[in-house]
Regions:
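A short, structured surface patch at a secondary-structure boundary
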Residues: 53-103, 107, 112, 214
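Flexible loop/hinge segments that line or gate small-molecule binding clefts
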Residues: 79-82, 118-150, 280
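Alpha-helical, coiled-coil/dimerization segments enriched in small aliphatic residues
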Residues: 75-78, 194-226
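Structured C-terminal subdomain patch of bacterial secreted/periplasmic proteins
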Residues: 149, 242-313
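Proline-aspartate-enriched helix->loop->beta-strand connector
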Residues: 97-99, 104-110, 127, 232-245
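Extracytoplasmic ligand-binding site segments that recognize negatively charged/polar headgroups
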Residues: 117, 133-146, 184-205, 250-253
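Short helix-initiation/N-cap motifs at beta->coil->alpha
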Residues: 36-38, 87-98, 220-231
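Bacterial Sec-exported substrate-binding components of ABC uptake systems
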Residues: 2-8, 19-57, 155-186, 247, ...
Length: 313
């Protein structure tokens, strides 16, 4: 009886030991992990080695946390030599899928608003894909955090975030004692002129700096629209201190649109901002789309134009 009892105990101990070993092996051999960006959870490779990137805005953030990629999108912007050397897959909104699939990536990073149309084809080829809803400056820190966790470079991401947030704070602190400027942010394209809401990049930076966006007084409730119709008549009634103009498209087409909608009308010359030479045309590179890690520099530019205050980093 005693031998039988001892044998049973030994058998139980062996089973438990084997179960424990099995559990450890399963955990250590996991090939995926779950990461979250802005409330959305994604399943990604545990240690991706071949990351194909379809958006250069995401690419710059990836390299900021010491990540590496195997592709980029076409661009006319000057890139660092390391990024320039990457295979270009076509325009951001028109990716060459044959070339992308040929890279044999173990993860693809893109944007919901540009690359959703490719998702089913990537899934059919069993390629893990993350499509970010990455748009405004509020998304920059979450993006750095996500990419740091993705590449297992969390400490680098934290360091970059600390510098980024410190520079943002430095710009905002410089304006604390200023009377808020009344600002209109116009969006000029070849098709016409509209006004930016706080959902747009430049207007969101204006808000962060405590300036008053005059278009806000014309909006009923909240809106997800980045731009809204805005006439010269309304602009004349608002008569802001400063007019920021964000451009998109060819210069000659933009000039023509501005003349038709605004500058050829005699009322334009009567605007306070025009008379005080405070109509500022902003470069699209920093002010049309999310400037990413250059957000502090973009905000410092707005601060300089509005208040004459220089902030350096």
């Amino acid at each position: 009886m005693k031998k039988l009892l001892l044998g049973s105990i030994a058998l139980v101990m062996i089973v438990l030991a084997l179960a424990g070993c099995g559990k450890t092996t399963s955990s250590s051999s996991a090939t995926t992990k779950e990461l979250t960006f802005n409330g959305q959870t994604y399943t990604v490779p545990k240690d991706p080695q071949k990351i194909a990137v379809l958006s250069n805005s995401v690419l710059s953030m990836l390299y900021a946390v010491d990540g590496k990629a195997i592709s980029r999108a076409n661009t006319t912007d000057k890139l660092a030599p390391e990024l320039e050397a990457l295979p270009a897959l076509g325009q951001t909104a028109n990716i060459n899928m044959e070339q992308l699939l040929g890279l044999k990536a173990d993860l693809v990073l893109g944007l919901v608003n540009q690359h959703k149309k490719y998702e089913s084809q990537l899934q059919a080829n069993n390629i893990p894909t993350v499509l970010f809803d990455y748009d405004g400056i509020k998304d920059n820190v979450p993006m750095l955090t996500f990419l740091g966790e993705l590449t297992n470079h969390q400490d680098k991401a934290k360091s970059v975030i600390t510098t980024y947030e410190s520079n943002i704070t430095k710009v905002k602190d410089a304006v604390k004692n200023q009377q808020p400027a009344r600002v209109a942010v116009l969006r000029a394209t070849g098709k016409g002129v509209t006004a930016e809401t706080d959902e747009a990049v430049t207007a969101s930076m204006v808000k962060e700096l405590g300036m008053t966006n005059v278009v806000a007084s014309h909006l009923e409730g909240t809106t997800k629209d980045k731009t809204v119709p805005y006439s010269l008549e309304t602009l004349t009634a608002d008569n802001p201190d400063i007019i920021f103009v964000v451009t998109m498209g060819k210069e000659e087409e933009i000039t023509k649109a501005m003349k038709q909608a605004m500058t050829d009308n005699p009322a334009w010359a009567n605007l306070k901002a025009v008379q005080n030479n405070r109509v500022v045309y902003l470069p699209s590179k920093l002010f049309l789309l999310n400037p990413g890690l250059q957000t502090p520099e973009a905000m410092a530019r707005l601060l300089k134009e509005a208040y004459g205050i220089d902030v350096t980093f």
